[in-house]
């Protein structure tokens, strides 16, 4: 069974200082399985922040996927991939997780996560 590799790169785009923890830089999962991509941010007021997820295909710009505000996906702009993508947020652990279901070759991209903080 072929493996689908998801290359993960997280960006903490903030206008204030924050710290980002990445448990895995890249992951490999079998095709048609699921992958969970998580990041933890040490930023004040994480529970009230909107977390945005993007992907970047080779030689392309960033493409918006979806965002989460409280605990579940609030917006899905993934071009009909609603059943494929889920995002969650855990305010107690300051973690956001993107779940990609039914992995296929086109999912081998760089994933970005972002949070904007206003002063």
UniProtKB/Swiss-Prot annotation:
Domain Ig-like: 23-119
Keywords assigned: Adaptive immunity, Cell membrane, Glycoprotein, Immunity, Immunoglobulin domain, Membrane, Receptor, Signal, T cell receptor
A GO CC annotation given for this chain: T cell receptor complex
InterPro entries the record matches: Ig-like_dom_sf, Ig-like_fold, TRG_var/const_region
Cellular localization per UniProt: Cell membrane
Any one GO BP annotation for this protein: adaptive immune response
Region forming the signal peptide: 1-18
Presence of keyword Glycoprotein: yes
Chief location of this protein within or outside the cell: membrane
Transmembrane segments: none
Glycosylation sites recorded in the entry for this protein: 32
Gene3D superfamilies the record matches: Immunoglobulins
PANTHER family: NON-FUNCTIONAL T CELL RECEPTOR GAMMA VARIABLE 10-RELATED (PTHR19256:SF40), T-CELL RECEPTOR GAMMA CHAIN (PTHR19256)
Assembly, per entry: Most probably, the gamma-delta TR is not assembled due to incorrect folding of the gamma chain. Gamma-delta TR is a heterodimer composed of a gamma and delta chain; disulfide-linked. The gamma-delta TR is associated with the transmembrane signaling CD3 coreceptor proteins following the stoichiometry: a single gamma-delta TR heterodimer associates with one CD3D-CD3E heterodimer, one CD3G-CD3E heterodimer and one CD247 homodimer forming a stable octameric structure. Upon activation, gamma-delta TR complex associates with FCER1G to initiate intracellular signaling.
Function: Probable non-functional open reading frame (ORF) of V region of the variable domain of T cell receptor (TR) gamma chain. Non-functional ORF generally cannot participate in the synthesis of a productive T cell receptor (TR) chain due to altered V-(D)-J or switch recombination and/or splicing site (at mRNA level) and/or conserved amino acid change (protein level).
Official protein name in the record: Probable non-functional T cell receptor gamma variable 11
Species for this entry: Homo sapiens
Organism classification: Eukaryota, Metazoa, Chordata, Craniata, Vertebrata
Gene name linked to the record: TRGV11
């Amino acid at each position: 069974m072929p493996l689908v590799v998801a290359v993960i790169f997280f960006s903490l785009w903030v206008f204030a200082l924050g710290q980002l923890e990445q448990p895995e830089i890249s992951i490999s999962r079998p095709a048609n399985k699921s992958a969970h991509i998580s990041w933890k941010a040490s930023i004040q007021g994480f529970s009230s922040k909107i977390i945005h997820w993007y992907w970047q295909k080779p030689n392309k710009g960033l493409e918006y996927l979806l965002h989460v505000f409280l605990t579940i996906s609030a917006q899905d702009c993934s071009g009909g991939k609603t059943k494929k993508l889920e995002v969650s947020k855990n305010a107690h652990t300051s973690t956001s997780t993107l779940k990609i279901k039914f992995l296929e070759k086109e999912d081998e991209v760089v994933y970005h996560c972002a949070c904007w903080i206003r002063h």
